[in-house]
């Protein structure tokens, strides 16, 4: 009678140990965030999260401000070894990975310069509207300037986010 109880006890200890070991796997970067990975993103339902937090390294080929949603759009030519982050749709942006810095993060996430070699950290997503993969939002960019969004930009984005929440809820 004691043998089945011992077997069950050993099984439970092994399960608990496996769960503990699984939880202790380090994230790919200390810049990964908890919570909703798409918090603050305009129209998040168009994005499918492939991974909550990924690292990408490459050279910036283009930086553009998107006035509608206030994002800073970065086209990143990936270093060798990071190509798996791309989809066929990324061919429409020159084979680059799209990286987006959202307005609420512009006070703490650097905006890189064209030609800079950078590392970025953030959720790796598929943009269903455009059909390409992105890091969106970028939670950390290794080089660039902090360019906070203006009060007017933040207000406009807040209205967009509120209207989007009303439209989808």
Residue ranges and their predicted role:
Residues 1-9:
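N-terminal Sec-pathway targeting helices
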Residues 17-18:
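C-terminal motif of bacterial Sec signal peptides marking the signal peptidase cleavage site
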Residues 21-169:
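OB-fold and OB-like single-stranded nucleic-acid-recognition modules
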């Amino acid at each position: 009678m004691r043998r089945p109880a011992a077997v069950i006890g050993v099984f439970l200890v092994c399960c608990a140990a496996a769960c503990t070991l699984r939880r202790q796997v380090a994230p790919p970067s200390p810049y990964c965030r908890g919570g909703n990975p798409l918090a603050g993103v305009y129209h998040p339902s168009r994005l499918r999260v492939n991974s909550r937090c990924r690292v990408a390294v490459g050279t910036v080929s283009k930086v553009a401000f998107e006035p509608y949603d206030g994002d800073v759009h970065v086209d990143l030519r990936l270093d060798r070894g990071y190509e798996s982050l791309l989809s066929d749709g990324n061919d429409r942006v020159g084979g680059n990975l799209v990286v987006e810095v959202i307005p609420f993060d512009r006070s703490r996430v650097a905006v890189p310069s064209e030609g800079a070699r950078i590392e970025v950290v953030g959720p790796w997503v598929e943009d269903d509207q455009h059909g390409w993969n992105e890091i969106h939002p970028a939670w950390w960019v290794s080089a660039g300037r902090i360019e906070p969004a203006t009060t007017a930009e933040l207000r406009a984005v807040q209205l967009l986010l509120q209207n989007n929440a009303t439209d989808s809820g």
